[in-house]
């Protein structure tokens, strides 16, 4: 019984950590894109054209 509960807790913890990491990564990317757009609109356009 305790082993089962422990496995569930471990799985929940891993899921929570993974979700948190993904959430932070998305926020970080959005913030960085927003900063780039505000500061350097011309270079961002050049980068898009080059790609």
Swiss-Prot record:
It is found in: Virion; Host cell membrane. One of its GO terms (cellular component) is virion component. The chain crosses the membrane at residues 11-28. The keyword Transmembrane helix applies. It comes from the Viruses. Keywords: Host cell membrane, Host membrane, Membrane, Transmembrane, Transmembrane helix, Virion. Its main location: virion. Interacts with GP2b and GP4. Belongs to the arteriviridae ORF5a protein family. Minor virion component that plays an essential role in virus infectivity. This is Structural protein ORF5a.
């Amino acid at each position: 019984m305790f082993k089962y509960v422990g496995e569930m807790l471990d799985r929940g913890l891993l899921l929570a950590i993974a979700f948190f990491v993904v959430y932070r990564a998305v926020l970080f990317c959005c913030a960085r894109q927003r900063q780039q757009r505000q500061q350097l609109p011309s270079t961002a356009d050049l980068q898009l054209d080059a790609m």
